[in-house]
Amino acid sequence: MSKEKFERTKPHVNVGTIGHVDHGKTTLTAAICTVLAKVYGGKARDFASIDNAPEERERGITINTSHVEYDTPNRHYAHVDCPGHADYVKNMITGAAQMDGGILVVAATDGRMPQTREHILLGRQVGIPYIIVFMNKCDMVDDEELLELVEMEVRELLSEYDFPGDDLPVIQGSALGALNGEAQWEAKIVELAEALDTYIPEPERAVDMAFLMPIEDVFSIQGRGTVVTGRIERGILKVGDEVAIVGIKETVKTTCTGVEMFRKLLDEGRAGENVGALLRGTKREEVERGQVLAKPGSITPHTKFESEVYVLSKDEGGRHTPFFKGYRPQFYFRTTDVTGSIELPEGVEMVMPGDNVKMVVDLIAPIAMDEGLRFAIREGGRTVGAGVVAKIIA
């Protein structure tokens, strides 16, 4: 079977459904695919094909995730849906499924539930920038006042976690009604699609961001100087650009005097490409794996941060025993391990394999970081956890 050519004509946006178990996330995902296929063309997907989510492994963590795609006249969406609560936690923390926006599904019959809060908190911690609410099962509630009450509660809950609760779109609908072809509920799915188009801004493309390349290797070339290699994460590196070497040691500035790819000289390297960058006047021992090459001033080195962490279960090859405060593993950022100590939240004495937990990490050497940076927790090269930088402290 030949792969269909991917059309690059429309902006591409990543979204996903979040919310409490059994509130209708997967039904809504199926309804969006089905209704939009009917209205705008595209491929319909039924509930069963989405619910039967394939197992994926991201950094050694097993996650069940379904990926579907759909189109509106203006955009192409990639949408992720997870069957279980644990899958959401893992997905959001590892960044396996990056979201430019989330669709929070809340059943009108239940209102806000524990996982509603947890997913909003996780969304805030891992940096999901925009949330749209779909109040589901509204066909099962006759009382208009009850619907208003649920909407108000959800808006308040979102505001509590610094989302603009008063202003974000809330759509009252019925995913099942829409799946069954009932016109009034199909219209609500179209309304949701329009909200996605207007409320979630077009994400900035990696190539348009400030230049950053994690350094994987360092070579010195006789008569030419020092070359660092790596895959450009974002932005563009042009010959003649001033760059900063950030992390582990003092930040130093230098100039890139050459860019090469597959032994050919180029004028520039772009996001996604593996390149070698020749650095002017830099000695081989001044640069090491684990540092980054970046546009000066665009990223700073830090040692202390608050993070959201998922600890691998024993079945995933993680620890067999809990850990306590004073635990000192390695934290693997981009290309290297750095030892660090942890502080657990008040009232948390120990962390069990399979848990997710908020912790403050203090590294022994600074790493170039932004909020939203992912890392792995390792013991002797074996991954035992995954995390994301939620807030930089120092």
Curated annotation (Swiss-Prot):
A Pfam family of this chain: GTP_EFTU_D3
Got a GO cellular component term for this one? cytoplasm
Single GO molecular function: GTP binding
Q: Where is this region: G2?
A: 60-64
Q: Where is this region: G1?
A: 19-26
- The record lists GTP as bound by 19-26, 81-85, 136-139
Which InterPro entries would you find in this protein's record?
Answer: EF-Tu_GTP-bd, EF-Tu_GTPase, EFTu-like_2, EFTU_2, G_TR_CS, P-loop_NTPase, Small_GTP-bd, T_Tr_GTP-bd_dom
User: Residue limits of the tr-type G domain?
Assistant: 10-204
Gene3D superfamilies from the xrefs? P-loop containing nucleotide triphosphate hydrolases, Translation factors
Q: Where is this region: G5?
A: 174-176
Region: G4, residue numbers: 136-139
Places the protein is found? Cytoplasm
| Residue positions binding Mg(2+) | 26
Q: What is its EC number?
A: 3.6.5.3
What ranges does the record give for the region G3, renumbered to this chain?
81-84
Keywords in alphabetical order, please.
Cytoplasm, Elongation factor, GTP-binding, Hydrolase, Magnesium, Metal-binding, Nucleotide-binding, Protein biosynthesis
GO biological process entries: translational elongation
Substrates-to-products reaction catalysed: GTP + H2O = GDP + phosphate + H(+)
The kind of enzyme this is, by top-level EC class, is hydrolase
Q: What does this protein do?
A: GTP hydrolase that promotes the GTP-dependent binding of aminoacyl-tRNA to the A-site of ribosomes during protein biosynthesis.
- Tell me, how does this one assemble? Monomer.
- Family, per entry: Belongs to the TRAFAC class translation factor GTPase superfamily. Classic translation factor GTPase family. EF-Tu/EF-1A subfamily.
Classification via HAMAP family: EF_Tu_B
Protein name per its UniProtKB record: Elongation factor Tu-A
Species assigned in the record: Vibrio cholerae serotype O1 (strain ATCC 39315 / El Tor Inaba N16961)
Please name the gene that encodes this protein: tufA
